[in-house]
Amino acid sequence: MAGAVISLGLSAQSNGLTDTSRSRHAVMSNTPLGAVKWTGGFWGERFNVYSGTSLQSMWDTWNNPDVSHGFRNFEIAAGTCPGEHWGPPFHDGDMYKWLEAVAAVYAVNKDPELDALMNKFIGQVVKAQREDGYIHTPVIIDERNRGIDTHAFHKDQTVIGTKVGAEDEKGAFANRLNFETYNLGHLMMAGIVHKRATGKTTLFDAAVKATDFLCHFYETASAELARNAICPSHYMGVVEMYRETHNPRYLDLANNLINIRGLVENGTDDNQDRIPFRDQYNAMGHAVRANYLYAGVADLYAETGEEQLMKNLTSIWNDIVTRKMYITGACGALYDGTSPDGTCYEPDSIQKVHQSYGRPYQLPNSTAHNETCANIGNMLFNWRMLESTGDARYADIVETALYNSVLSGVSLDGKRYFYTNPLRMSDNLPYTLRWPKTREEYISCFCCPPNTLRTICEAQNYAYTVNDSTLWCNLYGDSELRTSLGKKRPLAVTQHTGYPYDGKVVLKFVETPKKEDITLNLRVPSWCDKATVSVNGKPEAVSVTPDSYISLRRVWKPGDEVVFDMDMRTRLLESNPLVEETRNHVAVKRGPIVYCLESIDIEDGKSIDDVLIPADAAFTEKDITIDGSRMTALETMARLADNGDWTGKLYREVGSADKSVRVTLIPYYAWGNRDKAEMSVWLPLSR
């Protein structure tokens, strides 16, 4: 469908998380913020925890200057209190992500306390912002402490022409690694979501000023200075600002940002700018930066329809999904490494990469980095590809990442976090990894927690999409949708299901356009090869193809009921044999949920290293509760290897595995929520 010109019409949706209602190269659009509400079930429980406990505990963290200067930095920059900047340069963006989450929750519950909380933060942002639209608290605080009036143009303000310097230089864009454009991108998205959720423009006006500043900056900066695209959230932000304002200058900026990448001298694979983007066909470098870039380019494609961009994105997507993505939807295998792309037997061209994609099929488990932000970036990229193509395989990746490698980043009680998401945790590693093995309330690099919070608090906005005559069901969960397919064409639907642990989904039309054919598209997940559909109790003859949509078109009436029942069986999965770390291993998956084994769920206190899964293993479903959260566990009999003592040994003769042991596997997203334990997704296969 690449290159097709599709008009959603002026009557299609707007005010969604993203607004592609006027995008000529998108086939669907988000429902408006607040149009979908979780009414119970899996996502109702998760939303209640994260919109309550997580949101408040994170605000408490931001407000404790002994722990984090997240909010205090804005107060100092605004002149509300004295002090120095403290913390990483990307903290501003992290706070904007938190605010976006609050706005998304407010769109659902209209809680006046949340409105007041947002007003408090926004007031400091507006006061801190420079007259020219620039805002980056490290620089603003430094200027204020030097007596510069940030609300008047001043000759000592560093705006354009600053030399690129060392990392300790504080001027605007003095250091390309200072995450200024990353922060501004999240300001844009927060301002847009806040406006769409509340109708207010206080933060949005600040975002407009910031976008105008970026336009001026990139129009006048030197090529060296223009290389400011670390973790480019601003690509998505600028395109969404164009959609909200219809200012063509913003779309020109978005396109220029892609062009500038091809002009960088001495670029790096780690930052995806060693070669022009239009020459890139494989995923490379820092996985968060990469996925944010791909998402932003997908946004640009939806507006311009440039065929070359879709060729790049499709090739990169195939590279990720078929050679570089974990079974959990996670991305970024390497903590540190050397780029496989930037060298060919030339030592001088060897480049360092970090938190990055590796070589094809390089997917270690114990040392997997898999930063939560990268996994969220994978969601953002695939969501935008779905909007432009309507291809269900993109929605499938959104679901896989969301249920597994995104939810795994936060504890079930919503208070503790992982930065990395490995697929194996062992106490026997003879080295120390950079990040802790247990969930922490606060980690020094606090970018993932607010990103996870906003993603989960916005998940209801991924459930349905529409155009003038079609309703897509993308994510299944107990929910209520109240929207319109255009002016005075109301549509209301309820959904009841035990998903993701039960494959039966019941959709009921509550309000429909009169005497008008509407297409209902039900997504068939990649794992589903058998399902039935009935309408008002009568079976429908449908073709069930994994990674597709089942289309039902008719004049729907209030009271019509659709039952979509997917056969949800437990499956043993193997990896491509080129993935060395998982050769002759299996993973267990049921529906969209990837399972893992924690050592505390092995009878007799045996080690994970001793457990093998029989090829004919029979699994019994078991309802359990961990830390107040209900879920389905899987119980089976495994084989038990006689591993004995490996002290001082690297190799030895193969031992026996003639004993059995009962094991219970839990959803991967739930690991690390009980006592400290070893964990593994992949387990040796016993044939």
Name each region found by the language model.
Residues 15, 65, 313, 396-404, ...:
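C-terminal beta-rich recognition modules with glycine/proline-rich loops and embedded aromatic residues
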Residues 41-45, 49, 99-112, 185-200, ...:
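Well-ordered alpha-helical scaffold segments within catalytic/enzyme domains
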Residues 26, 78-95, 111, 148-150, ...:
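Solvent-exposed loop and edge beta-strand segments that line ligand/cofactor-binding
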Residues 515-536:
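Beta-strand-rich binding/interaction modules
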Residues 2-3, 13-94, 119-161:
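Low-complexity, Ser/Thr/Pro/Gly-enriched N-terminal "stalk/linker" regions
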Residues 78-88, 105-232, 236-268:
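Extended ligand-binding groove/face enriched in aromatic
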Residues 302-323, 363-415:
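Catalytic-core region of carbohydrate-active enzymes that cleave or remodel glycosidic bonds
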Residues 532-561, 570-576:
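A surface-exposed beta-strand-loop module
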